[in-house]
Regions:
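Extended alpha-helical scaffold regions
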Residues: 1-196
């Protein structure tokens, strides 16, 4: 129920005591709702509120949320990270689905990228590794360099890159000399100067 999701979101928002005591099985119920077809941004926001409390990451919940989402990745995530799904994303962009419908698949996708990024915030190794499995450096480069992609999505990927690859608990070896990283930085510079 969408109304219940708004109520629960507000009940948990910035409530460190309740958020730190929520049982994994209750988090699982939210993930199950998403898996059962409730791919709406407010369900992702419920998970986000459990992970970030008063602008501070809650490591336990971050780890639980990303673990549960990855376990049901096919049912819970809209990644748009292959040729076929990128074409679908572009169709949704062309019809303005994200502007016409706050519960659109594109808005869900953006909230999901943001959630995964927030699950890695604060250098949570388990979440970083799982997030890196969702989007490789090449995937991020593709997302950033795609002229059809929305600036809102691109900006989320820049933050994802920062939290998941650069600000990590365990350093990603060879990152400083990785050609893809430098291509990403060059692409960010081009995108920033042409789209801002």
């Amino acid at each position: 129920d969408v109304g219940a999701s708004y109520f629960i979101t507000e009940l948990f928002r910035n409530n460190a005591i309740i958020c730190s005591q929520i049982a994994e099985q209750h988090i699982q119920k939210i993930v199950n709702a998403i898996a059962e077809g409730f791919k709406q941004p407010q369900f992702v926001e419920m998970l986000e509120i459990l992970c970030i409390v008063n602008k501070k990451p809650l490591r336990r919940n971050q780890t639980i949320v990303v673990k549960l989402l990855i376990e049901k990745q096919q049912e819970t995530m809209v990644l748009f990270n292959d040729v076929e799904t990128v074409q679908r994303r572009n169709q949704l962009i062309d019809i303005g689905d994200h502007e016409a419908n706050e519960n659109s698949l594109l808005n869900f996708h953006m909230k999901m990228i943001d959630l995964i990024t927030k699950c890695a915030r604060g250098r949570v190794y388990e979440a970083e590794i799982k997030a890196q499995s969702l989007y490789s450096l090449n995937d991020i480069l593709t997302q950033l360099s795609d002229p059809k992609n929305l600036w809102d999505i691109k900006s989320l990927f820049v933050i994802f890159l920062q939290e998941v690859y650069f600000e990590t608990e365990k350093k990603v070896t060879g990152l400083a000399v990785n050609r893809t990283v430098w291509n990403i930085i060059s692409t960010i510079e081009k995108v920033a100067t042409t789209e801002i």
